[in-house]
A protein has these predicted regions:
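Hydrophobic alpha-helical core bundles mediating ligand binding, dimerization, or RNAP-core interactions
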Residues: 10-17, 29, 53, 57, ...
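A beta-strand edge to alpha-helix "cap/lid" segment located at domain peripheries
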Residues: 57-157
């Protein structure tokens, strides 16, 4: 896969995420892929990834928009900066619009995504929603646990 082909993959990847079509979104992944989402946690395999997109993302928000910028690709893994936005449908935050930026890491195998990770400042999204400080602290502790338990973090420390 070339850098241009990677950029094209990202374009279709984000359009399929915006559409909410779980199977279409999951078709970008290998059968055993893992999608590490900062809100919903890890999802493994196409069926679970499709469920996450269609039944979690699009249950909790509408008006999704996701764009990737400045993609780089070395033949095995790629990175891109992104902006994403949505409008919450969660009752206590209904109608509130959120916009966040993030960095995405893609490990590819045979032209498909084998692993996806993202790094975003979810606190910005929670502030835009009006999430209370106690709930934010609880979520931040969960995210801290995810980071500290990752094999890469353990090896690093």
């Amino acid at each position: 896969m070339t850098g241009d082909e990677f950029a094209s993959l990202l374009g279709d990847f984000t359009l399929s995420a915006e559409s909410g079509a779980g199977a279409r979104f999951a078709s970008h992944f290998t059968e055993d892929a893992v999608y590490h989402d900062y809100i919903y946690g890890p999802h493994q395999g196409r069926a679970d990834i499709a469920h996450m997109m269609q039944n979690l993302f699009h249950r909790d928000a509408t008006d999704y928009r996701w764009e990737m910028f400045d993609p780089v690709f070395d033949g095995r893994q790629g990175y891109a900066w992104s902006l994403s936005s949505c409008t919450s449908t969660i009752p206590q935050f209904k109608g509130r619009r959120v916009v966040i930026d993030g960095m995405s890491r893609f490990v590819l195998r045979d032209g498909l995504i084998a692993e996806y990770r993202e790094s975003v400042n979810g606190g910005v999204a929670m502030a835009q929603l009006g999430v209370g400080p106690e709930r934010m602290a609880k979520v931040f502790k969960r995210w801290t646990g995810w980071l500290e338990r990752r094999p890469e973090t353990i090896d690093y420390l």
